[in-house]
Amino acid sequence: MVDCQKEACNLQSCIQRNQYNQGNCEKFVNDLLLCCKRWYDKNSLTGNEAPHTCPELKPLLRQLSSRNLT
């Protein structure tokens, strides 16, 4: 499976189950953000394009910081 696609699908399923209330799915948001961070940590120097499921690095780092996940 494509990098972080599992986490993105889990988040989407949770949001749909909860009538699009993301507040009930924070664990899945965090899982996706942490997966994306791991991807950047592993691939940032390779020149690979980030997975379409992940934000760009700077916004990702801001989101991680605001959630105290750094």
Swiss-Prot record:
Can you quote a single GO CC term? mitochondrial intermembrane space
- What UniProt keywords apply to this chain's record, in alphabetical order? Disulfide bond, Mitochondrion, Repeat
UniProt motif Cx9C motif 1: location: 4-14
* Highest taxon of source: Eukaryota
List the InterPro entries. Answer: CMC4, Cys_alpha_HP_mot_SF
Does the keyword section mention Mitochondrion? yes
* Localization terms from the record: Mitochondrion intermembrane space
Which PROSITE patterns would you find in this protein's record?
Answer: CHCH
Question: Boundaries of each CHCH domain copy?
Answer: 1-43
Instruction: Give residue numbers for sequence motif Cx9C motif 2.
Output: 25-35
The induction comment states: Differentially expressed during meiosis.
Give start-end of the signal peptide: none
Do you know which Gene3D superfamilies this protein is assigned to?
A: CytochromE C oxidase copper chaperone (1.10.287.1130)
Q: Which cysteine residues pair off into disulfide bonds?
A: C4-C35, C14-C25
Query: One Pfam family this chain carries?
Result: CMC4
Q: What is known of its domains?
A: The twin Cx9C motifs are involved in the recognition by the mitochondrial mia40-erv1 disulfide relay system and the subsequent transfer of disulfide bonds by dithiol/disulfide exchange reactions to the newly imported protein.
Q: Which family is annotated?
A: Belongs to the CMC4 family.
What's the protein here called? Answer: Cx9C motif-containing protein 4, mitochondrial
